[in-house]
Amino acid sequence: MIIRFEEKLSVENAQLVCQWSNSLGKSFQEQWMGPMIPFPLTIQVLQDLEGIFSIFEGQEFVGLIQKIRQEDSNRHIGRFFINPQKQGQGLGRQALRKFVSLVFENRDIDSISLNVFEANQRAQNLYQKEGFEIVQMVEAPVRKYIMKKSR
């Protein structure tokens, strides 16, 4: 399994992400995009995101992930989404592991953080297996955890 990243998201791949996400409904979209992005998801919204990376397995587009912001020596990532038909095959684990390595290539970054909703147990398990630890719980509007991994 060869995972690679490309900066940005093509129109064709943005269309695929919209199809995958919109077919799973508004509450699903809020879990991976956050509550500020209107439903249904559109190509334009995806293409306007800064720091977005397309994830490929070989030549096949399989998902995306975003470098959201940098706070001092911490890089916050999110909007990590793998094609639902490809989930459960280890792609997410491989992609996350490789993306974390890519982020840590920047020597100014000492830690990586992300948010995960309490109800998203599958994602929490993945993040914990990859060395992320819960550092904070946020209650409003829905309980979520801030998880962090240090170098």
What is each stretch, according to the model?
Residues 90, 107-108, 131:
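Short glycine-rich hinge loops at helix-strand junctions in the catalytic core
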Residues 93, 118-136:
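Conserved active-site alpha-helix within GNAT-family acetyltransferase domains
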Residues 76, 81, 113-115, 146:
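Conserved beta-strand segments that form the floor/walls of ligand-binding pockets within enzyme
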Residues 83-85, 89, 118-119:
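Active-site acidic-Proline motif in GNAT/NAT acetyltransferases
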Residues 114-124, 140-144, 150:
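Conserved beta-strand-loop-alpha-helix junction that forms the acyl-donor binding cleft
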Residues 3-85, 96, 102, 106, ...:
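Acetyl-CoA-dependent GNAT
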Residues 105-115:
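Conserved GNAT acetyl-CoA-binding A-motif
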